[in-house]
Amino acid sequence: YNTGEMENGSALSFLFSRVEGDGYVNGTSFEAYNYFLGYGWESDDDKHNVQVIVTGAPQTHNQRTSSYYNMATAADYEKYGIRYNYNHGYLNGQEFNWRRNFYHKPIASVNWEYEINSTTNLSASAYYSVGRGGGTGDIGRLGGNYASSSRFRNDITGEVEWDQIVRSNSGQGGNWSGGYSYNNVVDAATGLYIVNDQDERVDGVKRNGFVRRASINSHNFVGTLINLKKQLSDKLTLDFGVDLRTYRGIHYRRLDHLLGADGYRDFDNVNYSGGSAVRTKTYSSNLGELWNVFRDT
């Protein structure tokens, strides 16, 4: 929608769209929105021009990873077809993937142009961008095996058997189609079903489950550009400018989905009391959680 220039010199533009679908590769569904709001004003004498813009495009899309340690082999593609996705399966009947990208990076800017006289122009711009999101993946081991092991996939379809992972993590007994089985036990220290126990379990299984984590790559970006242009002659123009900006990167990992477990034992910080900390809070990577870029993540 666009008003065109109105009598007071103002103009307003607005755009909003949505797209969703399934990718060519199995298990690569996607959903995205796009929004744009623009306001402009020009003075009657044409000396001042102001523009205010806010735009962004929150999106999520499931992926087929090319990670060396977590991807299908040529034999897998020969067996399951070229669209096969090693990270894909169904959880409670819904598509679920180890790998999901999610991001929202809105940007707001204010631009001002001022024609001081016929040979002198001043322009200034201030902008603010907030990026929030990242990508998900597996973390943990079960019986010494990583999530990339074929024992956690259906031999007929090649899909990850998510429901069995949930049953195993939650102490209900996971039984995979390939014959592997495991049942998590209650953690003595917490009384909960905890994944990533550092000790051998009572049945000798090294580690005891998987969860989905998210690696966050967020940022705050603020800046301003100011330029003064002076035309001295037909052959000589002077420009004086200022470019100020500040950037803060926010990089960490968080729990995305516990897959039936009550928590995850974290050993990544040597300052933890007792050498570890149990994490129970999860943060969703669903599209609906991306709109508010100022919330606690």
What residues fall within each predicted segment?
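Short N-terminal secondary-structure initiator segments
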Residues: 15-35, 104-106, 210-227, 276-286
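Short, surface-exposed, polar/charged, turn-prone segments marking secondary-structure boundaries
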Residues: 9-12, 16, 40-44, 78-83, ...
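Transmembrane beta-barrel wall of Gram-negative outer-membrane proteins
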Residues: 1-20, 25-64, 107-116
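Outer-membrane beta-barrel proteins
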Residues: 21-27, 59-65, 75-76, 132-137, ...
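Acidic/polar loop-and-plug regions of large Gram-negative outer-membrane beta-barrel proteins
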Residues: 40, 49-111, 135-214, 276-293
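Signature of Gram-negative outer-membrane beta-barrel scaffolds
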Residues: 211, 237-297
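Short, glycine/charged-enriched secondary-structure capping and boundary segments
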Residues: 28-30, 67, 121, 139, ...
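Outer-membrane beta-barrel transmembrane strands
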Residues: 92-137, 204, 208-243, 250-251, ...
